[in-house]
């Protein structure tokens, strides 16, 4: 082992915890499609042969939750008992009730409105207390840490070669892990280790799997990154066999992959999961907003690394605190960058929802392969549209 080695992991959409995330977000999307003002908090548990969906909801629409669950499982690829789980025949239990009126009153009429404010953005209070972080760095062109970006792309490619028939013996469950060497200036310099585990059918030998995965998944992905990878250590299915997988191998639960969902451990995390939550829940919307903030700080050239924290009190619109840190990479003081952030970004929940257009059925797409670093049209928090305003506000 040489150098300073940082590691991040990802999982495929067929990992049990990720199936749970995708089910929760698919239910959320179905409700938002019928009623964009739906309040949704949905959790999913799945194990051998059964799925349980529970939570609290306020909506004017009717959603056939069992149908949403089955369609998502089948789309992921669990469509036969031969694979250990079958969306056609698995049991689906639904236990969804109404949202607490005590919570609703604080969200519907924020503390500021109740104490005299007439600003429309003060009307909606935060759906809970809590702290959320956003992060960005210049490791990659999407301003994300390199280890998590490579791990996510490997997981995506592993799924792609399964679904398009390139490697038909693969099954949906899988994990990736990437170790990158960093130099003394925190710059990525070399791929050190790649770990990839993939569920497969009964008849596939490890030597075949390793050769195929290296050829069709790992080497093509590594070739897209401008960092040396010659001589990297490769570990494919280190247990030697991965036939039993998915919910048959491990129970899955919504919100169990919060580091995979974010920055691969390179940044702090407030602890709140995303999936199954509508944007009135600041666990989700404010984390997206702080990614937007941090990415724009780096895109503006104010720093090469930025982490931004925001915190809320339940029922209150204005954050109780904001903290911006650039780890010594800022071109001006962190305090000045923080002042610029507060001048350019409105971090009240209603303003975040408005500015990022979050009342849309976009969330199932976020639930696998990372909420950040994928510059898709729906991922409005990946825009760098405030970079010029930040530079001006910082006096540059």
From Swiss-Prot:
CDD domains the record matches: S-AdoMet_synt (cd18079)
Keyword hit for Zinc: no
Top enzyme category: transferase
Region (Flexible loop): 99-109
InterPro entries per record: ADOMET_SYNTHASE_CS, S-AdoMet_synt_C, S-AdoMet_synt_central, S-AdoMet_synt_N, S-AdoMet_synthetase, S-AdoMet_synthetase_sfam
Substrates-to-products reaction catalysed: L-methionine + ATP + H2O = S-adenosyl-L-methionine + phosphate + diphosphate
UniProt keywords, alphabetically: ATP-binding, Cytoplasm, Magnesium, Metal-binding, Nucleotide-binding, One-carbon metabolism, Potassium, Transferase
GO biological process: one-carbon metabolic process; S-adenosylmethionine biosynthetic process
Pathway: Amino-acid biosynthesis; S-adenosyl-L-methionine biosynthesis; S-adenosyl-L-methionine from L-methionine: step 1/1
Cofactor or coenzyme needed: Mg(2+); K(+)
Cellular component per GO, a single term: cytoplasm
One example GO MF annotation: methionine adenosyltransferase activity
Biological role: Catalyzes the formation of S-adenosylmethionine (AdoMet) from methionine and ATP. The overall synthetic reaction is composed of two sequential steps, AdoMet formation and the subsequent tripolyphosphate hydrolysis which occurs prior to release of AdoMet from the enzyme.
Binding partners and assembly: Homotetramer; dimer of dimers.
NCBIfam families recorded: metK
Name the UniProt record assigns to this protein: S-adenosylmethionine synthase
Organism of derivation: Nocardioides sp. (strain ATCC BAA-499 / JS614)
């Amino acid at each position: 082992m040489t150098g300073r080695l940082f590691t991040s992991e990802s999982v495929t959409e067929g990992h049990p915890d990720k199936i749970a995330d995708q089910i929760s977000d698919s239910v959320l999307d179905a409700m938002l499609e019928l009623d964009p003002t739906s309040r949704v908090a949905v959790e999913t548990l799945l194990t051998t042969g059964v799925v349980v969906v529970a939570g609290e909801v306020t909506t004017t629409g009717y959603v056939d939750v069992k149908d949403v669950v089955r369609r998502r499982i089948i789309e992921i690829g669990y469509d036969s008992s031969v694979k250990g789980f079958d969306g056609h025949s698995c049991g689906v239990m639904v236990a969804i009730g109404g949202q607490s009126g005590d919570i609703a009153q604080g969200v519907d009429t924020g503390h500021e409105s109740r104490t005299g404010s007439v600003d429309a953005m003060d009307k909606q209070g935060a759906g809970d207390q809590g702290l959320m972080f956003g992060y960005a760095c210049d490791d990659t062109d999407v301003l994300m840490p390199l280890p998590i970006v490579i791990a996510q792309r490997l997981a995506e490619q592993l799924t792609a070669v399964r679904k398009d028939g390139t490697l038909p013996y693969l099954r949906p469950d899988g994990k990736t892990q990437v170790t990158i060497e960093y130099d003394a200036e925190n710059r990525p310099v070399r791929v050190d280790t790649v770990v990839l585990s993939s569920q497969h059918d009964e008849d596939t030998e490890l030597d075949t799997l390793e050769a195929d995965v290296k050829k069709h998944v790992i080497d093509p992905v590594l070739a897209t990154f401008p960092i040396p990878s010659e001589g990297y250590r490769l570990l494919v299915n280190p247990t030697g066999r991965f036939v039993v997988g998915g919910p048959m191998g491990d129970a899955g639960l919504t919100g169990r992959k919060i580091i995979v969902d974010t920055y691969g451990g390179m940044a702090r995390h407030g602890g709140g999961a995303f999936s199954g939550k509508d944007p009135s829940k600041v666990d989700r919307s404010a984390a997206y907003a702080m990614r937007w903030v941090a990415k724009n700080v780096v895109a503006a050239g104010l720093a090469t690394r930025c982490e931004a924290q925001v915190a809320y009190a339940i029922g209150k619109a204005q954050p109780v605190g904001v903290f911006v840190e650039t780890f010594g990479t800022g071109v001006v003081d962190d305090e000045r960058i923080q002042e610029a952030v507060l001048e350019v970004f409105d971090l009240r929940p209603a303003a975040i929802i408005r500015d990022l257009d979050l009342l849309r059925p976009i969330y199932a797409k976020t639930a696998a392969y990372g909420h950040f670093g994928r510059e898709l049209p729906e991922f409005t928090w990946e825009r760098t549209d405030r970079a010029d305003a930040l530079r001006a506000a910082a006096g540059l």
